[in-house]
Amino acid sequence: MKITKIEKKKRLYLLELDDSEKLYITEDTIVHFMLSRGMEITDQELSEIQDYAQFSYGKNLALYHLSFKQRTTKEVKDYLTRHDIQPETISQVLDNLKKDNWVNDRKYANSFIQSNLLTGDKGTFVLKQKLTQKGISSTIIEEELSQFDFTELTDKVAEKLLKKYQGKLPSKALQDKLLQSLINKGFSYSQAKTAYQHLDIEEDQENQEELLYKELDKQYRKYSKKYDGYDLKQRLTQALARKGYDYSDISSVLRDYF
């Protein structure tokens, strides 16, 4: 069969044969097979051209996707699947991209962790979760995480949280809040506890007392509608204790309050 036309159509080329068959191919395919109008090709050569065109198109799509930022194997695979590239072609494309180091899950994980240490605020557990969602194996994740020390980051995040909550919570509640916030960000309890111990927390007794009285007023308005006497004091004591206030401080303000 003979090639009767090769015509550029945006990013692809339309190739027509004298048996009326048409197919879209990439410029790489034309160069690879040195195709030209009037060229005779066999059925076997046509099949090879079709396979290569699909591979070349898939690779071009992947490179376009990678041109914006680094991607994992899973991200590239999902992108090609959404663009109807066949599974066997996707495997070929990924093998080619990995060989040329366009896709490297280990390198991606390393960069992801470094970026978080420089500008992020997440601990190892959250990073593991995020990298796992991106399709990176647990082995690679663990090996890359083991290369980094999160002490400085944990301390930095703890300092930031302290600035946010200090003066707004009683001492015990402040400690609980800081520890829980650090754990929620993916740091281990041990890391959170150590970071908390590194903090320079100034106890402002006057502020603590002011917070306690303010909370007592709030709880009194709530419970005095239903309770009085001993029952009211018990309700207030329990409510204030749940807020993180010390029992001795609660007893002291209740004596002044009633």
From Swiss-Prot:
UniProt cross-references to Pfam families, sorted A to Z: RecX_HTH1, RecX_HTH2, RecX_HTH3
Main location (coarse class): cytoplasm
One biological process term in Gene Ontology: regulation of DNA repair
GO cellular component, one term: cytoplasm
Subcellular location: Cytoplasm
InterPro entries: RecX_HTH_1st, RecX_HTH_2nd, RecX_HTH_3rd, Regulatory_RecX, WH-like_DNA-bd_sf
Superkingdom: Bacteria
UniProtKB keywords: Cytoplasm
Family statement drawn from the similarity comment of this UniProt entry: Belongs to the RecX family.
Protein purpose: Modulates RecA activity.
Protein name from the UniProt record: Regulatory protein RecX
Originating organism: Streptococcus gordonii (strain Challis / ATCC 35105 / BCRC 15272 / CH1 / DL1 / V288)
